Amino acid sequence: MEEKQVKETRIVLVPVPAQGHVTPMMQLGKALHSKGFSITVVLTQSNRVSSSKDFSDFHFLTIPGSLTESDLQNLGPQKFVLKLNQICEASFKQCIGQLLHEQCNNDIACVVYDEYMYFSHAAVKEFQLPSVVFSTTSATAFVCRSVLSRVNAESFLIDMKDPETQDKVFPGLHPLRYKDLPTSVFGPIESTLKVYSETVNTRTASAVIINSASCLESSSLARLQQQLQVPVYPIGPLHITASAPSSLLEEDRSCVEWLNKQKSNSVIYISLGSLALMDTKDMLEMAWGLSNSNQPFLWVVRPGSIPGSEWTESLPEEFNRLVSERGYIVKWAPQMEVLRHPAVGGFWSHCGWNSTVESIGEGVPMICRPFTGDQKVNARYLERVWRIGVQLEGDLDKETVERAVEWLLVDEEGAEMRKRAIDLKEKIETSVRSGGSSCSSLDDFVNSM
C-alpha cells in the first residue's frame, strides 16, 4: 500500500461514552493515524476529547439525541447499553450517510466499533462498508462472555445462587471460579447473558481488534481465533503503542510534585476507576488501614464515588491529622505519569483492563479489589496467572488493608512480585517494538485494509 493511497483513506471509530472505553479507542485512533489513515470519531456527545489539542487532526461527529456518560451513571450499565443501541441506530446511519456524501463515497476503509456499540453494524451493512469489532477488555474476558452467552440461564442461575459453587473452578475457564465470572455488571443474570450474546456476535465483521498482547493471553487469543473464524489482532497494550491523553475528568497534576519528594518504591497509589462506587464504611476501613500501615500513599477519591458524600468529608479529622505528612488525596490523577514514577511501588486498583495493562506496562505490582464485570477476571489472572497481584476478597477491614499494603511495599513477597512485574513489563515492551507480536499484528491489520 503506497503512502499516498493510505493518506486518502479514512477509518471511522465508534467508542462507548465512558472513560474506560474512550481511552483505548482514542489510542487506537492514534496508532492508525500514525500509519497514515485519516480518523473520524463518532461520539454520542461532545466532550473534552473532541476539543483536545491532542486530537486536532481527527474529525469528530456527534450522534444527535443520544446518551451521555451521566446517563450511564443514572441508568446503570444494562439499561444504558440496551437503550443506547435502540436509539442510536437510525441517527448513526444518517451520520455515516453524511460522511460518505462528504467523502465522495469511496473514502472509508472500515468502521471500527466498540463491541457494546453493536447498533453500528446495521449502518455499515446498509452502506456495504467493512466493519471491525474493537474489544476494550482482555481476550480472557471476551472468552468468558462468549461461554456465558451460550449457557442455560435457568440452570446457571441455580449454580450461581449456591454458596458451595462459588469457589469452584468454572469448567473450561481455569483458573476462573464461578465467583470470578463477569456476571454482575448488567444487573440480573438473564439481562447480562442477553447483552453478552449481542457483544460476542461479530455478525459480518471482517476482524476483531483486542487491546492485549500474546505474551499476556496466548491461550485465550488462540481460543478466540478458532471460535470467531475471522482474524483476531492483539495489538496492545495501546497505551504504549500510541499514547493518547483522553481523560474525561480533569487531572490534578500537583500529585506528581508530591511524588517527587518520596523515596523509590515507597508509595501505594490507590485509584478505583471512573465509575466504581464505594460505601462510607469501606472508605473508612481503607483510610485507617492506610494510616496504620505507616506507608506513604497517593489516593484518588473521585467526587461522587462515595454515595451521600460530595468528596472526602466523611474522612475523620483524626485521620487527616495522622497522615498529613505522608498521604496525598486528589480527585483525579494523571495515571500513566503516576505509575511510571519511581516513587510508586504498588497500585491498589479496581482492575479495569486499562488500569491493569497500564500497571503491567510499568512493572508495578497490584492490590486487587474488583467491583464488577471483567474486573474480577483480571484480578484472578493478576493473582494466579501472572502472579503480580494480591486480591482482597470479602468484607474490607482495616487490618486486611494494613497487611496488604505492608506485604506489597515492605515484605520480601512484595519484592518478588515486583521482580515478576518487571519481567512482564520487559515482555510487553518487546511485543510493541518493531518485529514484536503486537507491532506485527498492527501492521497485519493495516495491510488488510
From Swiss-Prot:
Binding site for UDP-alpha-D-glucose: 274, 333-335, 350-358, 372-375
A single GO molecular function term of this UniProt record: quercetin 3-O-glucosyltransferase activity
Keywords for this protein: Glycosyltransferase, Transferase
Name used for this protein in its record: UDP-glycosyltransferase 76E2
Disulphide connectivity of cysteines: none
InterPro entries: UDP_glucos_trans
Pfam families assigned: UDPGT
EC id: 2.4.1.-
Gene responsible for this protein: UGT76E2
Family: Belongs to the UDP-glycosyltransferase family.
SUPFAM superfamilies associated with the record: UDP-Glycosyltransferase/glycogen phosphorylase (SSF53756)
Function: Possesses low quercetin 3-O-glucosyltransferase and 7-O-glucosyltransferase activities in vitro.
